[in-house]
């Protein structure tokens, strides 16, 4: 099967650091009690409790029987999958990397999460389409004028979660990307772009590269995959390059670009500045080089990776599975979804053709 081509090592540490209470259902499993494993970007509060109260009521109505939906907070996608396979949970949202690396037994990919599209990234296109740098150039016009350190909550439409001026509110997409940020003097920027356009990996690397942990999709994996396509045989792979020339690499977040003068290229989530509030009066504004003469811009974006996927236990009947997916969609459409928007889910869609809607997209990004 396709997913056997993806090799992942799941550290045993996951099983020891996750509290036992997160691995065991919070109620005795029965036909009328379902357990959802969820992630939160904030502490569980009354809004989350209310969400599951509403969800339980709607599910009970669809199935014409009393159903209670309880939840556990579990952040790791592999643990969520294991819980469903072990019959300790019935539903969970997991990242697409975990789906790609799993044997896909005991559960069904049910719904695809969606998020509001960025203005200049509305289509699911790839490196070979030749549009990734064009997207970056168009986004730079929004990102850099005015520069981030001058962004204002009112002018740039800060909502409390994001800067709305960067988004296309009427468009939902199922994917995200990594971005490659570059900084330096005018001559350095020109030289970095020259090395990129000439596909000269050795020259490109000399400018210093900031990356994330090896298990980070946006800050390690997606840039690595992009470089494999772009630099081709001249590229040894990101980890091999780090091992060979460690002085040319460092762990750096995108918002910290320009602090380390030896690092001119940094990987980050695409448009991470869109949800990072500019703190007026800060002595060290994010996305702002220390040297006032240095510039900053997005060089390019990576290929896409799918947003989180809702998976459901195969121990549930198809009627149960379908009802769960429909309720998520209905709550989002009626603006009653108190959970999804808190972690970036602005909508959902049923997965009708797993091979086409999930497998083919993953294959195209990872390479067949």
From Swiss-Prot:
Subcellular location per the Swiss-Prot or TrEMBL entry: Cell membrane
Record's signal peptide: 1-25
Does the keyword Iron feature in the UniProt annotation? no
Keyword Transferase: yes or no? no
Which key words tag this protein in UniProt?
Answer: Cell membrane, Lipoprotein, Membrane, Palmitate, Signal, Transport
A Pfam family annotated for this chain is CypI
Q: Which domain of life is it from?
A: Bacteria
UniProt topology in membrane: Lipid-anchor
**Lipidation positions, renumbered (N-palmitoyl cysteine):** 26
Q: Where is the lipid attached (S-diacylglycerol cysteine)?
A: 26
Q: What is its main location?
A: membrane
- GO cellular component terms given for this protein: plasma membrane
Xref: PROSITE patterns: PROKAR_LIPOPROTEIN (PS51257)
In terms of InterPro entries, this protein maps to: CypI, CypI_dom_I, CypI_dom_II
Entry function: P37 is part of a high-affinity transport system.
Protein name per its UniProtKB record? High affinity transport system protein p37
Gene name per UniProt? p37
